[in-house]
Amino acid sequence: MTPTLAQRHLTHPGTSTPRATDAQLRARDWAEIQERMLVPLYDAVHERLEVGAGTRLLGLGCGSGLALLMAATRGASVTGVEHLCPERLALARERLLPDGLWGDHAADARLMEGGPEAAVDVSRPPYNMITAFQPIGCMSGDSEGLAPLLQRAAPLADRGSLVVLAGWGPPERCTTSSVLRVATRLADPLRSTGSWRPSERDDLEDVAQRAGLKPDGSGRVACPFGYADMDSAVRGLLSTGLFDAAVGATDARQVRKELTEALHPHLRRDGTVWMANVFRYLVARTR
C-alpha cells in the first residue's frame, strides 16, 4: 500500500485533470505525498490497540482516509467524518467505497461530510474506538476545536471506549519544526492563531481533560518525512494547510521560494529530501 502511494506522486496531479481547482490539487498532494508520512503513527496505534474485526471505529477529521483504509484492511468497521476539507473526503471515497477508483477495499465503510453527528446510525451498535489523527501542537490555536469535537463524539461510543489523539513531538526531535517557522515569518505577526509554536509536553493530555476523557497511556513514534525530490517536498508541506496564512499574507510564489530555501539543508546528494520527526499519541477512554 505505502509503495503505491509513494510512486503515484511523481507525476503532478494537475497534468491529468487540467480543470482541477487549487483545493483539489492540494488535496491530491496530501493524499499522494504527505499523508503517507504518518503511516508509522497509524500502524503503531492500530497494532497497540489490536484494531481488528471487532473494532467499530469512528475517525474524526478523516481527511483522505488512509488511516481508515489501514484499519479496514485489519478487519475493522470504519466510519469517517470530515468537516473542513470536502476535497480530501472525495479522495477518501475513492479509496474506501466499493465504487471508488481504488476498488472494494472495505465493504463496511461509511464516509460523511460534517461533524460527529453525521455518523449517528441507530441501526448500528455504538462505536468502541474514536480517532483524531490530525496532529496538534505546531500552530497556535490548532487544538482549540478538538475538545468540543471529542465531547460531541463521545456519546456515540460505548462507555470506556478507546479514544486516540495525535500530536507533534518535542521540537528538538522534529526537524520539520525549523521549516514550519517559515510560515510564521511570512504570515502576519499580529495573528493570534495560525503561527508556529513549539509543542508542549501535555498538549494532548490537556485536550483530553477538557473533553472529559480519561487518559490511559501514550506513545511516541518516529515519522520521518522523506520526499523523492524538492518539488515533492514543497508540494507535500503546502498541502498540510500550515502555510495558508503565509500565502494569504504574501503570495504562493514567495512562500514556495522561502520554503525551498528552508528545505535546502535537508536535501541529500541523491536529490531526495529527508527530515526526522517524532510524533506523540495519547490513548484515552470515554467516561
Where are the model-predicted features located?
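Conserved class I S-adenosyl-L-methionine
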Residues: T2-T55, C85-R88, P98-D99, H105
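Conserved Class I S-adenosyl-L-methionine
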Residues: P3-L5, A23, A27, L38, ...
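Class I SAM-dependent methyltransferase SAM/SAH-binding core
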Residues: L58, S64-V120
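Class I S-adenosylmethionine-dependent transferase superfamily signal
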Residues: A71, R152-A153
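A short acidic, Gly/Pro-enriched loop at the edge of an enzyme's catalytic core
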Residues: E117-I130
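Residues lining the SAM
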Residues: A132-I136, A166
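A short, conserved alpha-helix within the catalytic core of class I
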Residues: C138-R152
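Conserved catalytic/acceptor-binding region of the Class I
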Residues: A154, G160-G226, D244
